[in-house]
Design a protein with these regions (language model features):
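Positively charged n-region of N-terminal signal peptides that target proteins for export
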Residues: 1-6, 104
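A detector of low-complexity, intrinsically disordered, Ser/Thr/Gly/Pro/Ala-rich segments
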Residues: 2, 9-10, 427
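Bacterial N-terminal signal peptides
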Residues: 6-17
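Mature catalytic domains of secreted/periplasmic carbohydrate-active enzymes
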Residues: 22-437
Length: 437
């Protein structure tokens, strides 16, 4: 009898092993499954952090460097020779990564994406691949280590942003790009090996031709080191088949797990995962990613409306802050994130774990749904009533979460919501509908 039990156990283990081998993303790279994407789809809000030596001057990270290949953005203010020496003055002694992560969590964020290397090539960890890194600043300490440890401590999912562009590396876009491939693959290996669990790899644009990049080798390594990691859609955003066509099946995984509209709210889209990345600092030149004291800080109300517009469109919001050169977050950003967090604590249940719809969002606001519940998020409007698209189903009950009592009438032309002006929320009036099953 015991022998039969052991045989059965052995067969179960063999079957499990075969299943794992069949689903080994390193052996056969593939996009993330729906199950692997679920935490991200439920999270809705992440914190993006752009930082580096550019903060010493309060200029746009990378783009302020005069002499980069794209001098048409209007950011260019610092000669390359001066920009490339800013790291010698980068000494953020007041950095408290634990405080940053507490701030993110209290704001309602479920994940954080931190800049490890931007287009200027400077590395915020002690990489072995170049001397242009944090070790050779007055600060010297591994900032990525501090971010990773604090994120893990506070239960935030960890993401690394990595720019595959590198305007200061001598081998970037040279010849067949093989030396640069070796360089950046080795850096990705460091980032996915030395910091515990990494949940997101957020690439940002590489240029050239398909044949110049070993994408299959890269993604096999990524999935070998972090089997359930999510990867955005920018690993090959500006790689064009001018000389070589992508090999069969390559686009299936290189196109990534989700889209990334930038400085704009994505369109309503329930069939493809997407995440809008937007800055808390608004600048006239369209930047504001890194510390920009010349910019305007979006207040909590504006950030909430951006979040609601994103989530009702079935997307996530990656909201960006740019720390000061001291290592501190700007006080007004901290204040507005705390206010946003207070709102999320009260109303986040209408966003977290939901999907956008069942009707498209618009200037009026939008809707989220989960089970038999639909939450209407209504931005301020004129008049007594608001006519929305028709709902696919019959409303069983209505509850106004932000005060007052709305009435909802279903007609052949749509859904009419009526609520007196004094009962409307200044930012987002939320009406909960229970639908008949």
């Amino acid at each position: 009898m015991m022998q039969m039990v052991w045989v059965a156990v052995a067969m179960m283990l063999l079957a499990a092993s075969a299943c794992c081998v069949a689903d080994d993303r390193s052996a056969s790279p593939r996009p993330a499954s729906a199950g692997e994407m679920q935490w991200w789809r439920d999270a809705k809000l992440g914190l993006f952090i752009h930082w580096g030596p550019a903060s010493v001057r309060g200029v746009e990270i990378s783009w302020a460097r005069i002499g980069h290949p794209f001098d048409h953005h209007g950011h260019e203010t610092v000669p390359a020779g001066e920009y490339d020496q800013l790291y010698k003055r980068f000494d953020p002694e007041k950095l408290d990564a634990d405080k940053w992560m507490r701030m993110a969590k209290q704001a309602g964020c479920k994940y954080v994406v931190f800049i490890t290397k931007h287009h200027d090539g400077f590395c915020l960890w002690p990489t072995k691949q170049t001397d242009y890194n944090i070790t050779n600043t007055p600060y010297k300490r591994d900032i990525c280590r501090q971010i990773a440890d604090a994120a893990h401590k506070h239960g935030l999912k960890l993401g690394w942003y990595y720019s595959t562009r590198d305007w200061t590396h001598p081998d970037y876009l040279q010849g067949d790009n093989s030396r640069y491939n070796d360089y950046y693959h080795a850096q990705i290996e460091e980032l996915l090996t030395n910091y515990g669990k990494v949940d997101i790899l957020w690439f940002d644009h590489v240029c050239g031709n398909w044949g110049d990049y070993r994408f299959r080798d890269l993604f096999s390594m990524i999935y070998r080191l972090q089997p359930h990691i999510l990867v955005n859609n920018r690993a090959a955003r500006f790689v064009f088949p001018t000389k070589d066509q992508p090999e069969a099946g390559l686009l299936d995984f290189v196109n990534g797990d989700y889209e990334t509209p930038e400085q704009q709210i994505g369109a309503y889209h329930i069939d493809r995962a997407w995440e809008s990345c937007m800055t808390m600092t608004e600048c006239k030149d369209g930047g504001g990613w890194s510390y920009r004291p010349d910019g305007r800080t979006r207040d909590a109300a504006e950030c909430i409306k951006i979040l609601v517009s994103t989530v009702t469109g079935d997307g996530n919001l990656l909201l960006n802050v740019g720390p000061m050169p001291t290592g501190e977050i700007m006080p007004d950003q901290v204040e507005h994130l705390a206010e946003m967090g207070a709102w999320m604590k009260q109303y986040g249940g209408t966003l977290y774990g939901t999907r956008g719809g069942p009707i498209p969002n618009g200037a009026w606001g939008g809707a989220t749904r989960k089970g038999d519940r639909v939450w209407l998020h209504l931005f301020p409007w004129q008049g007594e009533s608001l006519t929305l698209p028709a709902l696919p189903g019959k409303v069983a009950s209505v509850k106004t979460l932000t005060g007052g009592q709305a009435t909802v009438t279903q007609t052949a032309d749509g859904t009419v919501v009526t609520l007196g002006p004094k009962d409307r929320h200044a930012v987002d009036t939320i009406v909960e509908l229970r639908m008949e099953r």
